[in-house]
Amino acid sequence: SKIGINGFGRIGRLVLRAALEMGAQVVAVNDPFIALEYMVYMFKYDSTHGMFKGEVKAEDGALVVDGKKITVFNEMKPENIPWSKAGAEYIVESTGVFTTIEKASAHFKGGAKKVIISAPSADAPMFVCGVNLEKYSKDMKVVSNASCTTNCLAPVAKVLHENFEIVEGLMTTVHAVTATQKTVDGPSAKDWRGGRGAAQNIIPSSTGAAKAVGKVIPELDGKLTGMAFRVPTPNVSVVDLTVRLGKECSYDDIKAAMKAASEGPLQGVLGYTEDDVVSCDFTGDNRSSIFDAKAGIQLSKTFVKVVSWYDNEFGYSQRVIDLIKHMQKVDSA
């Protein structure tokens, strides 16, 4: 089945890279603010992930990547995008604007069959690869791939809960800057702190990522909450999860459980490292979450802090494609 991308921002462009890498077919891109020639440039050059290795060009009004033709639309409203013209059925909604079932459903007018929101959603069912994909059923038309932070936290929480039972926990994500922030102090009426200069501040912020884990792991509903610090790095973030456990264990027990999961059921989603790593070491890492065995600490047999890294752009974009591939498998069964 063919994929369309609405919104050619950080995630939209990296979803296209991920699709090419993973053998998924993107046939259309819509963005009202980016002309075709500029799309070529923005896709080719990336300050964080480097230059695209293949060939990118504009040809006959289409974006051509490695010889594959991608139809380009410049529609402002989702209901006006003629997806069926390009044969696009699975739409990645990565504008960050149409994040509810009602708003995302506008894509169906132009021929879309399914919509995958690349952000948390207030009402669409949320999926995290490695955690709750089995809950997807073909009658679901609009789904959410949750947030990059939920994708990092949920696999770690799953392993902890299944092995040692999470009683309650608090999460902090030390998060790289994103497009919504300001380069210097500027207006941000809904989030005053968020309007302060991104390059010169550590900015406390809210995040629904921890609460969202309760949506993908129902047994943890109401047991986790969290906040964020936005820091002046361009990419790669880290989750710090402090939990009270129901079963006594040593920190070595936790390490062993994480390592086993990373080599078994969560391979490709959860990573494990005992190296002396720092954030840059995870640029371009396509896993959702990499458990840092050396960074975690334990106070008592039931009170621990675990640390896990994630490339908040790249790993997440790969999961969008993984989710679509799973949906296609279920839908065609």
Curated annotation (Swiss-Prot):
GO terms for molecular function: glyceraldehyde-3-phosphate dehydrogenase (NAD+) (phosphorylating) activity; NAD binding; NADP binding. The record marks H175 as: Activates thiol group during catalysis. Keywords: Acetylation, Cytoplasm, Glycolysis, NAD, Oxidoreductase. It comes from the Eukaryota. Its EC number is 1.2.1.12. NAD(+) binds at R10, I11, D31, M76, N312. It is found in: Cytoplasm. D-glyceraldehyde 3-phosphate binds at S147, C148, T149, T178, T207, G208, R230. Pathway: Carbohydrate degradation; glycolysis; pyruvate from D-glyceraldehyde 3-phosphate: step 1/5. The modification N-acetylserine is found at S1. InterPro entries: GlycerAld/Erythrose_P_DH, GlycerAld_3-P_DH_AS, GlycerAld_3-P_DH_cat, GlycerAld_3-P_DH_NAD(P)-bd, Glyceraldehyde-3-P_DH_1, NAD(P)-bd_dom_sf. SUPFAM superfamilies: Glyceraldehyde-3-phosphate dehydrogenase-like, C-terminal domain, NAD(P)-binding Rossmann-fold domains. GO terms for cellular component: cytosol. It holds the Pfam family Gp_dh_C. It catalyses: D-glyceraldehyde 3-phosphate + phosphate + NAD(+) = (2R)-3-phospho-glyceroyl phosphate + NADH + H(+). The keyword Transport does not apply. Its main location: cytoplasm. It is an enzyme of class 1 (oxidoreductase). One of its GO terms (biological process) is glycolytic process. Belongs to the glyceraldehyde-3-phosphate dehydrogenase family. PANTHER family: GLYCERALDEHYDE 3-PHOSPHATE DEHYDROGENASE, GLYCERALDEHYDE-3-PHOSPHATE DEHYDROGENASE-RELATED. This is Glyceraldehyde-3-phosphate dehydrogenase. It comes from Panulirus versicolor.
